[in-house]
Swiss-Prot record:
Function description: When injected intracranially in mice, induces a series of symptoms such as quivering, climbing, scratching, barrel rolling and paralysis of limbs. Unexpectedly, no effect is observed on ionic currents when tested on locust DUM neuron.
A GO molecular-function descriptor: ion channel inhibitor activity
This protein's name: Conotoxin VxVIA
Signal peptide: 1-22
Length: 74
């Protein structure tokens, strides 16, 4: 009888703990989901480097000019 009560209390405690942690994780995921569409849009937009920023074989300088000797945007 005592063992049964202890097991029931343990199961109730573990269930409550799982529900509490699942709720906190769900809130965290919801926060990241709100940022996800912006991340997808951000990946497809071209970013350019300002003057002094790095450039390489495929320059992405805002000015359109890359000094490939020094690897910087002009």
């Amino acid at each position: 009888m005592k063992l049964t009560c202890v097991l029931i209390i343990a199961v109730l405690f573990l269930t409550a703990y799982q529900l509490a942690t699942a709720a906190s994780h769900a809130k965290g995921k919801q926060k990241h989901r709100a940022l996800r569409p912006a991340d997808k849009h951000f990946r497809f937009t071209k970013r350019c480097n300002n003057r002094g920023g790095g450039c390489s074989q495929h320059p992405h300088c805002c000015s359109g000019t890359c000094n490939k000797t020094f690897g910087v945007c002009l």
